[in-house]
Amino acid sequence: MNLAAYYPVLLFLLVGTGLGIALVSIGKILGPNKPDSEKNAPYECGFEAFEDARMKFDVRYYLVAILFIIFDLETAFLFPWGVALREIGWPGFIAMMIFLLEFLLGFAYIWKKGGLDWE
């Protein structure tokens, strides 16, 4: 395996990381930093904070977010498949039908377990 082809990528990563660290460091060193009690006070729309900013969220929010990401990712696989359907032929069609069957089985399982019910 010829690793010389990856040297530009490595150089790009090193320069990008170094430049990012350098710019953040320069901003921290040269930027004005004069904290006082007013600047460190909690602020919420011109008023003192009414309650703790760290409210607990219901676990269902996270469940809905995870389910959305999973199903959105599965749906994203449909677009390249639709574009390349003529080139991949029957094997690609059968593979995608198996994928969609697994997708529908997962959707039915989540629906049956109540993952889509809010109450």
Swiss-Prot record:
Catalysed reaction per UniProt?
Answer: a quinone + NADH + 5 H(+)(in) = a quinol + NAD(+) + 4 H(+)(out)
A GO cellular component annotated for this chain's UniProt record is:
NADH dehydrogenase complex
The domain of life for this entry's organism is: Bacteria
A GO molecular function assigned to this protein is: NADH:ubiquinone reductase (non-electrogenic) activity
Q: What is the main EC category here?
A: translocase
Q: Return the InterPro entries for the record.
A: NAD(P)H_OxRDtase_bac/plastid, NADH_UbQ/plastoQ_OxRdtase_su3, NDAH_ubi_oxred_su3_sf
Membrane-traversing stretches = 7-27, 63-83, 88-108
Give EC number(s), comma-separated.
7.1.1.-
The alphabetical list of record keywords is: Cell inner membrane, Cell membrane, Membrane, NAD, Quinone, Translocase, Transmembrane, Transmembrane helix, Transport, Ubiquinone
Q: What does this protein do?
A: NDH-1 shuttles electrons from NADH, via FMN and iron-sulfur (Fe-S) centers, to quinones in the respiratory chain. The immediate electron acceptor for the enzyme in this species is believed to be ubiquinone. Couples the redox reaction to proton translocation (for every two electrons transferred, four hydrogen ions are translocated across the cytoplasmic membrane), and thus conserves the redox energy in a proton gradient.
How it assembles, according to the record, is: NDH-1 is composed of 14 different subunits. Subunits NuoA, H, J, K, L, M, N constitute the membrane sector of the complex.
- Mind telling me what this protein is named? NADH-quinone oxidoreductase subunit A
Give the species: Burkholderia mallei (strain ATCC 23344)
Give the source lineage, highest ranks first.
Bacteria, Pseudomonadati, Pseudomonadota, Betaproteobacteria, Burkholderiales
